[in-house]
Structure formats: C-alpha cells, structure tokens
Amino acid sequence: MARTPDLRRRQQLLDDLIDEFAAGGIGDRSLRDVAAAVGTSHRMLLHHFASRDEMLLAIVEEVERRQMAVLSKLPTDPAESFAAMWATLCRPELRPFERLFFECYSRGAQGEEPFARMVPGAVDAWLAEAAKVGGPDNDPALVRLGLAVTRGLLLDLVATDDDAGVSSAVQLFADLLRRPGWK
C-alpha cells in the first residue's frame, strides 16, 4: 500500500523549490538537478509531486496563493486598493518570485506544458478573488484593467529595475482611478 505523502515535508520541499527557482529560474533543469539543489532526491520529489510537471504547477500555484492572500486585506476604494497592492508586490525581496512568475507565464503563453495550464487560472483566480473581496459594486472590466496594469508594471520593474519610472506610472494610474467616472 502506498503511503500518503507527509504534507509538512511536501510543504517544506515546496518552499525550498520556490526559493531555488526564484533564485535561478526554471530553465530546462532536470529533476535530479533540482533535487540536488534543494537537498533531496529526485525520487522524493516524485513521491511528493508525482511528476516534474506537477511539481512546477504546485510551485506556480503556491506563489500565486501567497500573493492573492493580500487581496482580502486591501481597501475597497479602487485607487487605494491598487496603491496598497502595489506597495506589497513591488518590494525588492519579491522580485525573484515575480521573475519566476513571468518566466512561467511567458512559457505558458507560448503553449509550453505544464505552464499553459496555469495561464487561465493566473487570470481567472485573481479576478474571482478580487470580485469576492470587492463585492457587488466591483466593475469586472476595472478589476481586469487593474490586474493588467499591475502585471505590466511588475514586468517593467523586474526587467528594468527602474523604481522611479515605474513608481511614477503607478502614481499616475492611481490618480486616474481617483477621477470621477473611474469607479
């Protein structure tokens, strides 16, 4: 009879894998290389994640889950919510994780598996969570625009490290959200 994976050990491996991939990207690294980097064996990774693809999806889902956790703590005003979300996401210590997200997202947009399976959820899950938090007055188009602007500015930031330029664009978008007719 097969043993149920130890969930604490799986979570610890997942945390270690996220840190490893955030530091060095995913690339085409083999399961053996990844296992060695996090101090385990490829068999243990397979035991906990079943396959390389499932391991990669678990990594993406966990990073997204961590980022979405902040939504319930945001103000309901769109401009204030955007500014607070940005203040959370733009922290320098999160940039490796943002780079990891964009690596996975771009590979998924090209149709590469398993990343292609994550792209719809990377949009739909955020929109659904924002709708729950914002309530019935949330404009779905405005929520989608906010997500697109946030991701575009994050991509700009992680690619250029131009904090000042991106911060100016963030402030401009927040100011636009404060104008009459944007809520």
Please place each PLM-identified region on the residue numbering:
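N-terminal intrinsically disordered/low-complexity leader segments
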Residues: M1-R8, G181-K183
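Hydrophobic/aromatic-rich alpha-helical bundle segments in the mid-to-C-terminal region
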Residues: E112-V123, V133-K183
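Amphipathic alpha-helical segments used for helix-helix packing
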Residues: P92-P120
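Hydrophobic alpha-helical connector segments
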Residues: A58, A69-E98, L142-G146
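Solvent-exposed, amphipathic alpha-helical segments
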Residues: Q12, D16-A23, A69-K73, L100, ...
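Amphipathic alpha-helical interaction segments
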Residues: Q12, E54, E80-A84, R99-E103, ...
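Helix-turn-helix
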Residues: Q12, D16-E54, A58
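Short, basic, alpha-helical segments at the C-terminal edge of helix-turn-helix-like DNA-binding modules
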Residues: E61-Q67
